[in-house]
Amino acid sequence: MQDARTRALYVRGFLRAILSRYAPLSPDEWRFEYGEKGKPRLCAEQRDQTGLEFNLSHSGDYLLLGVMRAGSENVELGVDIEHARTSTDIYPILNHYFSPQEVTALLNLPENRQRQRFFDLWALKESYIKATGQGLAKSLKSFGFDLSEAREETLPMRLATGLDSPFYSESVASELELELELYRGIGLSFADNGSDKKVEPNPWQSCLGRLNEEYRFAVTLGGSVKPMALDARLVCPNNLLR
């Protein structure tokens, strides 16, 4: 297991390599700046030049990187990946960080599904506050997600090939295609004097996906007039987070 500084170097190097797949800039040319609460973004000149938005998250051995060709749209993008830890006592946390409607919906589920829903909601909430750039300065109880009308789809995840990276293993460049569970049509509401008030039309789009039984990811996009389209690629950087 590498220390935090080494892991951070790998993540930054990988981010630069991936961004260079989307624009004619070499990995060492990318320049970043940070929002008031620390959200990373491209410097203004490169944002205007490339039209790219990005956000990233990591958990365990997984790194999730979201990249969007936003063009001139002023959008907010946030992603999160979460591990459903069996050691977490979820119930004391509910009333501190979840909206009343989220708590009620979770507790109405069979007990064997409540832990999964907890981490589903946590991933969604993290993706939203990361999109806004407010981080934990925004109360997690001040907004809530509703999965009661979520639609299940499948999202193909293909193996990315041709990455010019020392971490990439060409030996795994086979016809691998995974079908991920993906949920769309997730509602988002905001607290209004102690109750949840639904905002219509909702300027936010969120989706929830599962990599496997233990890991799920969420993507939240704000400010776009177009439906969110996802293209999932699996990149195998040897020892990136090990």
Predicted regions and their residues:
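Core catalytic alpha/beta fold that binds nucleotide/phospho-ligands
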Residues: 1-242
